[in-house]
A protein has these predicted regions:
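Iron-sulfur-associated redox domains of electron-transfer enzymes in respiratory
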Residues: 1-193, 202-204, 220-225
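Short amphipathic alpha-helical patches
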Residues: 87-88, 234-238
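Short cysteine/histidine-rich metal-coordination sites, predominantly Zn2+-binding motifs
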Residues: 197-204, 225-235
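Residues that flank catalytic or metal-binding motifs in active/ligand-binding sites
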Residues: 207
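The −1 position to Zn-ligating cysteines in a subset of zinc-ribbon hairpins
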Residues: 210
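Short, cysteine/histidine-rich loop/knuckle motifs that typically chelate Zn2+
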Residues: 213
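Short Cys/His-rich local motifs and their 1-3 flanking residues in nucleic-acid-associated proteins
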Residues: 216
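Short Fe-S-cluster ligation motifs
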Residues: 240-246
Length: 246
């Protein structure tokens, strides 16, 4: 049985009623609930940059995760701090696994995270009583095992060296490869191209926009500029067999 007992976004309660619901859930199911954390955790200046009910978010996260049987970090901010942790940030933001050290954290990176991956992670636990196998960054292999490039619908165009040269050109309209327009699919692991978004409706490349590498650590710093062709060394790296054939 799955029961969503506390969610700031979805629950009708607010303020003290919402916080009371969280406390009641923790008391009713000690070491028997899954904590799903969204958003980065600011640590600078005593955690003042994010407070809930007058308490630092960091304090609440530590309290909730301490009594959880499992912790899932959803989205890039919860994964590694996201935009608040990018260069120039002052909040001291970190991801959940950078803050909670005494429990295994399942990281579902992405901006946005795909809800299908969250559902699959929880269903596997409910069914098998164990969380999915993960990579070295705590990301489930079923979702982050292959590069976006490997499963991309534009891969045949890449292999034929059919690249979009500018937005709106004939190649763009024909669905050619967006690598030269900045697509970071070769160096990004995610299952966006196979499960897509909005119930399988579409995903960025199918909409004519390249991958920005949002599942990658510190992507706001490491994947910019987004609209400049990827470093040729990435392709060289992949061609050496460190990933499967392009």
């Amino acid at each position: 049985t799955l029961s969503l007992d506390y969610s700031e976004v979805l629950m009708a309660a607010a303020g003290t009623q919402a916080e009371a619901a969280r406390a009641a859930t923790m008391a009713k199911y000690p070491n028997g609930y899954i904590a799903v954390v969204e958003g980065s955790i600011p640590l600078a200046d005593g955690g003042v940059y994010c407070t809930v009910g007058g308490r630092a978010f960091a304090e609440i996260v530590k309290e909730v995760c301490a009594g959880a049987l499992g912790v899932i970090a959803v989205g890039s901010c919860a994964f590694d701090g996201g935009i608040p942790a990018a260069r120039g940030g002052i909040t001291g933001a970190v991801g959940v696994s950078g803050f909670i050290k005494d429990k295994k954290v399942i990281n579902l990176s992405g901006c946005p995270m795909n809800p299908e991956n969250l559902t699959a992670t929880i269903v596997q636990y409910l069914t098998l009583k164990e969380f999915p196998a993960t990579d070295e960054l705590g990301r489930p292999l079923f979702a982050y095992g292959d590069s976006v490039h490997q499963r991309c619908e534009s891969l045949p165009h890449f292999r034929k060296k059919e690249f979009v040269k500018e937005w709106g050109d004939a190649g763009h309209r024909a669905g050619w490869c967006l690598y030269q327009m900045g697509c970071k699919g070769p160096s990004t692991v995610a299952n966006c191209s196979t499960i897509k978004f909005n119930g399988g409706t579409s995903w960025p490349v199918a909409s004519g926009h390249g991958c920005v590498g949002c599942t990658t650590p510190r992507f706001w710093d490491t994947m910019v500029p987004f609209y400049v062709e990827g470093d040729p060394k990435v392709i060289e790296y992949l061609n050496k067999g460190l990933r499967s054939e392009l």
